């Protein structure tokens, strides 16, 4: 055991916050690092840490003529993604974790992990990262402190969060903060040679909702180690939102302005592989319309003094899936990356010191793949891991809305829920009211691929696209959504309208009916015109869909039959959906709000009343 007084840097804290100082000393005593460094967020610190990571072989400096001030990382092949089976919600009461989360009693988990943490930072530096999710100028800034032994995490957190000395100053001596503890779990004996990506076979990502703590061990991958992201901003924040009357959601936020200059804000929840980042950075194909980005992944929504729901993006960077991001699908993301200051992980490296991944056009004749091996277009495997990532400052996005910086957030006019369904779900459906919208979100689904499941087209529920991220019982989460619909003054007209979209419907030959990408602006146009009371809709058993000719398809290479099928509500397909929803709802027992059962019964009755 190393007494904390002997750990270099332990007594050089740039703060007098007593609870923070006590916690740092406690963790230093437990983990026994060689030294403690308080991350200040400066350019000099970025240079020092990236230089050290390059020297250690963890990072490769990219060609500055291609990607200025940018780096490439290659992880251990076993440490490439979030590990949901090792992710726990350690609520005091097991029932509060619910059927969608892994649970362990908090005392048992802390005993287990305390032994893993004991001496786990030996031979390494312990970094203390003060950070804030969302603007520091907010009425109630959302502070966090991450303790980590990974310099890769320090560099990435500088991109993804507002962090450093300015956060410590804003915290003063008494601000509350989320305690976020992370270790890669790879202590070094004296003289032991380090590896380029240290990690541990044993992994835990544990959340303690009542005490607002996160303990992560064994993984250096971003989703498991950048604890401000999913761990704080969704799992812990969703519990805070439940307790305090707001929502923490897995949603993009965009601003759309019509040719007449009227601006609206839309939030959208989409499961993975459904184009959330692409929609957030949309380039409209219809003349006169403009889209700006507020956020691509997380939205915190609170009621404003006017009774409307306002959203902020708590993140400072983009942590996007690389494959499939290209000039055709998301030119604004590519422009953001071209401005440099980024970290790329598990993509491929070109011979001239740039990065490449599948989807970026013709592959070069030679690459070094994500495992460090030679790769050519004749290779039988992909050059980049399917979950390879870019980490880049959102402030470099060329269409970032000025509203992004507003600590009060932006007023949300519409909420989208979207999944990947080859049939059944129309291109766009408008909910009848807020509770019907919650039903649509609670039953949100996507189809798995053959690679993921061994069977194409298996429908999996992903409520509000939050399945891996709800920090408490999902039945209570649905109830919280319903309660939020009562607003602050009972005026439902101030609530966002809710829509369910599906860009992925296919025809009988298996081809996508809708072109997607920039053409999705046509669906957003119809939604805006619905908000303004100008677009026609048709009543169906599942909600309102665009009337014939209400959707602007001018210039699209689509037949009227294609459009009809894309918007079709097939009674037989929807009746086949009912037992799947029933099975899903039964998971939650008496925690499921009765109004959602009532919505299902009403849908069944409307379908039964339709002519076959």
UniProtKB/Swiss-Prot annotation:
It comes from Salinispora tropica (strain ATCC BAA-916 / DSM 44818 / JCM 13857 / NBRC 105044 / CNB-440). It comes from the Bacteria. Monomer. Catalyzes the conversion of oxaloacetate (OAA) to phosphoenolpyruvate (PEP), the rate-limiting step in the metabolic pathway that produces glucose from lactate and other precursors derived from the citric acid cycle. It catalyses: oxaloacetate + GTP = phosphoenolpyruvate + GDP + CO2. Belongs to the phosphoenolpyruvate carboxykinase [GTP] family. Its main location: cytoplasm. The gene is pckG. Mn(2+) binds at residues 230, 250, 297. GO terms for biological process: cellular response to glucose stimulus; gluconeogenesis; glycerol biosynthetic process from pyruvate; oxaloacetate metabolic process; propionate catabolic process; response to lipid; response to starvation. Keywords: Cytoplasm, Decarboxylase, Gluconeogenesis, GTP-binding, Lyase, Manganese, Metal-binding, Nucleotide-binding. This is Phosphoenolpyruvate carboxykinase [GTP]. Its EC number is 4.1.1.32. It holds the Pfam family PEPCK_N. GTP binds at residues 273-278, 389, 420, 517-520. Its cofactor is Mn(2+). The active site is at 274. Pathway: Carbohydrate biosynthesis; gluconeogenesis. The keyword Lyase applies. InterPro entries: PEP_carboxykin_GTP_CS, PEP_carboxykinase_C, PEP_carboxykinase_GTP, PEP_carboxykinase_GTP_C, PEP_carboxykinase_GTP_N, PEP_carboxykinase_N.
């Amino acid at each position: 055991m190393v007494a904390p007084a002997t750990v270099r840097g332990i007594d050089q804290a740039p703060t007098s916050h007593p609870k923070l100082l006590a916690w740092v000393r406690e963790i230093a005593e437990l983990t026994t690092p060689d030294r403690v460094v308080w991350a200040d967020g400066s350019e000099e610190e970025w240079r020092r840490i990236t230089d050290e990571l390059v020297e250690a072989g963890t990072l490769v400096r990219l060609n500055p003529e291609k990607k200025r001030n940018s780096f490439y990382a290659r992880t251990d092949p076993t440490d490439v993604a979030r590990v949901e089976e090792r992710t726990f919600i350690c609520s005091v009461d097991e029932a509060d974790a619910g059927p969608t989360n892994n649970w362990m009693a908090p005392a048992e988990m802390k005993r287990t992990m305390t032994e893993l943490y004991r001496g786990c930072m030996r031979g390494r530096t312990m970094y203390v990262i003060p950070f804030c999710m969302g603007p520091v100028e907010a009425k109630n800034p959302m502070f966090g402190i991450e303790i980590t032994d990974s310099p890769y995490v320090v560099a990435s957190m500088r991109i993804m969060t507002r962090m450093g000395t300015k956060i410590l100053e804003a915290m003063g001596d008494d601000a509350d903060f989320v305690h976020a503890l992370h270790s890669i779990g790879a202590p070094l004996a004296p003289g032991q040679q380090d590896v380029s990506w240290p990690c541990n076979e044993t992994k835990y990502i544990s959340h303690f909702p009542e005490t607002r703590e996160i303990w992560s061990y064994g993984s250096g991958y971003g989703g498991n180690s950048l604890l401000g992201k999913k761990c704080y901003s969704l799992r812990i924040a969703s519990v805070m939102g439940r307790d305090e009357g707001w929502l923490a959601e897995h949603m993009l936020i965009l601003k759309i302005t019509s040719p007449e200059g009227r601006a609206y804000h839309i939030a959208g929840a989409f499961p993975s592989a459904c184009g959330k980042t692409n929609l957030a950075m949309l380039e409209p194909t219809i003349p006169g319309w403009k889209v700006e980005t507020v956020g691509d992944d997380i939205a915190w929504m609170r009621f404003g003094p006017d009774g409307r729901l306002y959203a902020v993006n708590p993140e400072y960077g983009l942590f996007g899936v690389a494959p499939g991001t290209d000039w055709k699908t998301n030119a604004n993301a590519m422009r953001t990356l071209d401005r440099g200051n980024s970290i790329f992980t598990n993509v491929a490296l070109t011979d001239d010191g740039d990065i490449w991944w599948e989807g970026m056009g013709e592959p070069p004749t030679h690459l070094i793949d994500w495992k460090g091996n030679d790769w050519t277009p004749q290779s039988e495997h992909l050059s980049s891991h399917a979950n390879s990532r870019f980490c880049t400052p959102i402030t470099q996005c060329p269409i970032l809305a000025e509203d992004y910086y507003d600590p009060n957030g932006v007023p949300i006019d519409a909420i989208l829920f979207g999944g990947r369904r080859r049939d059944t779900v129309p291109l766009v459906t408008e909910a009848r009211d807020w509770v019907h919208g919650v039903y649509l979100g609670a039953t949100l689904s996507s189809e798995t691929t053959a690679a993921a499941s061994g069977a194409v087209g298996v429908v999996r529920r992903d409520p509000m696209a939050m399945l891996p991220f709800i920090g408490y019982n999902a039945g209570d989460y649905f109830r919280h959504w319903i309660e939020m619909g009562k607003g602050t003054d009972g005026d439902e007209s101030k609530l966002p309208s809710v829509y369910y979209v599906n860009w992925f419907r296919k025809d009988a030959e298996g081809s996508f009916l809708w072109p997607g990408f920039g053409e999705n602006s046509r669906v957003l146009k119809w939604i805006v015109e619905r908000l303004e009371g100008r677009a026609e809709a048709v009543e169906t058993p599942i909600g309102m869909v665009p009337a014939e000719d209400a959707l602007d398809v001018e210039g699209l290479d689509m037949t009227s039959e294609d459009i009809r099928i894309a918007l079709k509500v097939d009674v037989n397909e929807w009746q086949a959906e009912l037992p799947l929803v029933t099975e899903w709802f039964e998971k939650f027992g008496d925690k499921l709000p009765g109004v959602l059962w009532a919505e299902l019964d009403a849908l069944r009755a409307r379908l039964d009343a339709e002519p076959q």
